[in-house]
């Protein structure tokens, strides 16, 4: 009996300690709502990277860091932080301004010379390579789709650089978003198919009666590399006049310019004279999709995509954790680095830039905590990724989650509950109780890679965690609004994150990095899997690989992080879309030659794709 009482006493003391920490690390649902309401407001116009709305969001975050007393990250002589309205901004390159140049020409000879007006009869696309061509033949190639996995090829026969392919917009499936040709019918894959076929240029017939109403004719650039050939959209009337053309002169002149894009970085310095030189990164992306377009699940609406859950919720989480830890800076041993990333929706551009231009040493970065879509919790279910990237993660997460069951009730007048550990005051009233439903139902995934910013850090062998409450019907749509966020549960998620950060901060020694077990390959629209982690930044000379999944075909072939793929089989690879098109050509179990650049040297490797589950 005495042993049982002693055990309960020890348990109570431990739980009380957790409860005291919980009280110190208590996030505010009201403050979260304040941040999300502004970030997801119409005023910021969807926060598309490179736009005024995204820049206003960056200013807001920077001002919050400044108001809280966080200091800017240290800038080096070679990599200064560019200033917009605060010292907290790290600027990275982003092409956001696209305009017509002065030398756009489309003319045909068919008995008479016909000159077509750029902007009215035709429009070069933002991804078009600038070039002047004298073409001798027009070939009509259906929808311009090559999909070997579907036994479909609109390019039959042999083609030359003197030919221009004219294709229809869309796919044989019509507007069905779940059709067989959804992937192969995307613009970039049509461009890759035309380039692979060998034609000199690609013209796409508009589906609109007036070219000005066609979204494809609106100059934009996706920051994923140039097409490699001239590409343009033409009106239906222009297409009819090309039918009997004997000679075509095509010159494309698109002016692309960088616009400011930013990561926002604030620092709370640790108090330990030695450990303050180690860093814990807490991050979330603040950009979204603007008014739709690339990445939107309602691309034609033209409405503001508010991005409340994706990812104003995670950004608000960064700001609230910065507030909490700033009040306890004297208790911190290590230095906390808070980063709001730009360019995530465009392909992890901001986080990828940071890990290649770090403002604190990567080898001293002990962990990265990423929050992406943490505002729509249901039934207390929470997904945590990256658990396999450090030996200690699973135990730390489990302990922190259990501590959520503890509640301080210093002013409670209720009787002590029976059968649970308690701590009582001098008058016998409970000052700490246990809430058996306080913890989350966790799904813990091992993999450190994934479609968010933690992936960039894991590729540099840094332990990562990724917090996510799951997708929903408003994902990437205008309807992802601030009023649908569950602020109370988000505050509890941040309580869990804060506990984990506190434990990582106090750990001695630091976390032990491990290579995580990769998730099994699934879906993706292709029958094969290689296991590479592509870098989605702008590229015209090959596809850079950020990482290789363990025990994958890429790993077995000898590919390494930092390799640049320039050719797969007979297909040249200049960017991620060429690479994806190459995947569509491949068959599981068949050996292919893959050429890569490594340290300036070209290597030829052999790879055998694996079938997807």
Where do the model's predicted regions map?
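Bacterial N-terminal signal peptides
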Residues: 7-19
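Soluble metallo-hydrolase cores and metallopeptidase-like ectodomains found primarily
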Residues: 24, 97-101, 117, 121-157, ...
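N-terminal capping segment at the start of a domain
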Residues: 27-52, 68-74, 86-89, 213-223, ...
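Noncatalytic luminal/extracellular "stalk/propeptide" segments of secretory-pathway proteins
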Residues: 34, 45-172, 176, 254, ...
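Metal-dependent peptidase/peptidase-like ectodomains
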Residues: 115-117, 231, 239-240, 341-470, ...
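Acidic/histidine-rich catalytic neighborhood of metal-dependent amide-processing enzymes
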Residues: 185, 189, 260-263, 290, ...
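His/Asp/Glu-rich mid-to-C-terminal helical/loop segments that flank catalytic regions of hydrolases
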Residues: 231, 323, 327, 473-519
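C-terminal recognition in membrane/secretory proteostasis and scaffolding
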Residues: 442, 477-479, 496, 505-613
């Amino acid at each position: 009996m005495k042993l049982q009482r002693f055990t309960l006493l020890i348990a109570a003391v431990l739980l009380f300690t957790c409860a005291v920490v919980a009280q110190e690390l208590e996030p505010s649902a009201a403050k979260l709502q304040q941040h999300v309401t502004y970030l997801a407001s119409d005023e910021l116009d969807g926060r598309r990277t490179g736009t005024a709305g995204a820049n206003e969001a960056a200013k807001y975050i920077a001002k919050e860091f400044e108001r809280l007393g966080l200091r800017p990250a240290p800038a080096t002589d070679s990599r200064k932080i560019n200033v917009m309205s605060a010292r907290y901004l790290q600027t990275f390159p982003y092409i956001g301004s696209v305009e017509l140049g002065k030398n756009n020409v489309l003319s045909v000879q068919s008995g008479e010379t016909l000159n077509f007006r750029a902007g009215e009869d035709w429009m070069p696309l933002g991804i078009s390579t600038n070039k002047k061509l004298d073409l001798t033949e027009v070939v009509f190639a259906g929808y311009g789709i090559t999909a070997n996995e579907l036994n479909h090829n609109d390019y039959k026969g042999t083609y030359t650089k003197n030919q221009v392919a004219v294709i229809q917009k869309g796919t044989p499936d019509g507007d069905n978003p779940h059709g067989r040709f959804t992937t192969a019918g995307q613009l970039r894959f049509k461009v890759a198919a035309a380039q692979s076929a060998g034609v000199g240029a690609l013209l796409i017939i508009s589906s609109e009666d007036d070219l000005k109403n066609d979204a494809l004719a609106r100059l934009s650039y996706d920051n994923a590399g140039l097409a490699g050939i001239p590409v343009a959209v033409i009106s239906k009337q222009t297409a009819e006049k090309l039918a009997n053309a004997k000679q075509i002169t095509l010159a494309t002149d698109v002016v692309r310019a960088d616009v400011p894009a930013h990561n926002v970085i604030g620092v709370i310095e640790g108090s330990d004279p030695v450990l303050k030189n180690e860093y814990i990164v807490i991050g979330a992306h603040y950009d979204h999709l603007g008014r739709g377009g690339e990445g939107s699940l309602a691309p034609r609406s033209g409405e503001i995509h508010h991005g409340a859950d994706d990812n104003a919720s995670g950004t608000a989480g960064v700001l609230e954790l910065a507030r909490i830890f700033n009040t306890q800076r004297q208790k911190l041993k290590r230095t906390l680095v808070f980063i709001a990333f730009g360019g995530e929706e465009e392909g992890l551009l901001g986080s990828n830039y940071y890990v290649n231009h770090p403002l604190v040493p990567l080898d001293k970065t002990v962990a990265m905590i990423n929050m992406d879509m943490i505002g729509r919790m249901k039934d207390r279910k929470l997904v945590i990724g990256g658990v396999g990237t450090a030996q200690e993660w699973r135990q730390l997460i489990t302990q922190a989650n259990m501590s959520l069951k503890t509640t301080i009730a210093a002013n409670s007048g209720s009787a002590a509950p029976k059968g649970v550990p308690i701590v009582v005051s001098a008058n016998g009233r409970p000052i700490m109780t246990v809430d058996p439903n306080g913890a989350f139902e966790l799904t813990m995934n091992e993999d450190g890679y994934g479609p968010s910013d933690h992936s960039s850090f894991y590729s540099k062998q840094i332990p990562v965690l990724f917090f996510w409450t799951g997708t929903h019907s408003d994902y990437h749509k205008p309807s992802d609004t601030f009023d649908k966020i569950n602020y109370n549960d988000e505050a509890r998620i941040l309580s869990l994150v804060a506990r984990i950060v506190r434990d990582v901060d106090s750990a001695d020694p630091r976390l032990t990095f491990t290579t995580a077990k990769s998730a099994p390959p699934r879906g993706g629209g292709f029958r094969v899997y290689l296991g590479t982690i592509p870098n989605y930044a702008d590229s015209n000379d090959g596809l850079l690989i950020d990482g290789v999944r363990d025990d994958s075909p890429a790993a077995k072939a000898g590919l390494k992080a930092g390799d640049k793929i320039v050719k797969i089989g007979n297909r040249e690879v200049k960017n991620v879309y060429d690479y994806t098109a190459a995947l569509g050509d491949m068959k599981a179990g068949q050996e292919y030659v893959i050429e890569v650049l490594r340290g300036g040297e070209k290597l030829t490797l052999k790879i055998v794709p694996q079938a997807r589950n």
